[in-house]
């Protein structure tokens, strides 16, 4: 049966079969949804901004459902949102939250050089889009890809490090598809870079906390803060003080994450892969 971590017991064949059936059903439903929205491109509203939010939210939620079922099928114990020691895990992740919150152009919004032009329903659906992307990408790239890579080889801190590099590189490279929608080459390269870094940071948090929901929250907040003004407003996002603060914070948290990673003992990950509490 399924425990609080969302993981099936890893041995009984019957449970595996149930998860296999569930996975096939969810995949079939998700495939239909993706076909309807990505190929059919339905117009749910004449407002192009809202229509984009609707489409992204529905398709990413469908994709997330597939990968959450697969996490259960694999038996990875990362889905308990209040897994003990929760408060210690939250404390460990605080520097990462500082990074993602700093992605919001706080100073430009405060001094008026940036401002929002949309609110209300637009803001609600923008939040929904950010959450759906966080759910989908964290389930796929941390909950499945990273944990599958790490499961095969995790005898040392070096193994844990290279698992993160491999999974984060794939996560970054997948953004090359944005070139197909006429995104600028420079913009895509920049997106690959910060996707690699945010992926690596979330990977360390997952290793240390065994809590995928913290990764989802980090990812969603990062996307929300970074895209708020471009999506729902206008103005200058980067000013000199913001750049200086961002660089200092990025360097400090990078050092923190590297030290944290190499202090993680490989056996700590046993609680993700088996029934160790």
Predicted regions and their residues:
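Residue-level signature of transmembrane alpha-helical entry/exit and packing/kink sites
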Residues: 18-26, 52-60, 88-92, 122-126, ...
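Transmembrane helix-loop-helix hairpins at the membrane interface
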Residues: 126-276
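N-terminal, membrane-interfacial amphipathic/helix-forming hydrophobic leader that caps
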Residues: 1-79, 224-277
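Juxtamembrane helix-loop-helix connectors linking adjacent transmembrane helices
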Residues: 43-56, 71-140, 144-156, 236, ...
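Hydrophobic, membrane-facing alpha-helical anchors
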Residues: 3-16, 81-86, 116-120, 167-172, ...
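Juxtamembrane "helix-exit" motif on the non-cytosolic side of transmembrane helices
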Residues: 36-46, 103-113, 176-183, 228-233
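Membrane-embedded alpha-helical transmembrane segments of multi-pass integral membrane proteins
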Residues: 62-63, 102, 174
């Amino acid at each position: 049966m399924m425990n609080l971590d969302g993981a099936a017991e890893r041995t009984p064949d019957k449970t595996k079969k149930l998860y296999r059936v569930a996975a096939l059903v969810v995949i079939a439903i998700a495939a239909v949804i993706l076909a309807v929205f990505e190929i059919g491109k339905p117009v749910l509203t004449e407002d192009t901004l809202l229509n984009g939010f609707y489409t992204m939210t529905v398709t990413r939620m469908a994709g997330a459902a597939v990968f959450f079922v697969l996490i259960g099928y694999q038996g990875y114990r990362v889905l308990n949102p209040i897994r003990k020691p929760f408060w210690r895990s939250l404390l460990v992740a605080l520097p990462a939250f500082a990074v993602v919150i700093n992605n919001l152009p706080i100073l430009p919004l405060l001094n008026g050089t940036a401002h929002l032009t949309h609110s209300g329903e637009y803001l609600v659906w923008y939040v929904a889009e950010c959450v759906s992307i966080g759910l989908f990408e964290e389930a796929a790239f941390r909950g499945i890809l990273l944990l599958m890579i790490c499961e095969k080889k995790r005898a040392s801190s070096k193994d844990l490090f290279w698992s993160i590099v491999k999974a984060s590189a794939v996560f970054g490279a997948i953004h090359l598809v944005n070139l197909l929608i006429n995104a600028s080459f420079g913009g895509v390269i920049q997106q690959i870079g910060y996707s690699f870094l945010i992926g690596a940071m979330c990977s360390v948090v997952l290793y240390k906390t065994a809590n995928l929901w913290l990764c989802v929250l980090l990812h969603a907040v990062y996307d929300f803060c970074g895209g708020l003004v471009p999506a729902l407003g206008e103005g200058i996002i980067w000013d000199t003080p913001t750049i200086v603060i961002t660089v200092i914070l990025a360097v400090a948290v990078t050092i923190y994450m590297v030290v944290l990673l190499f202090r993680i003992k490989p056996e700590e990950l046993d609680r993700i892969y088996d029934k160790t509490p």
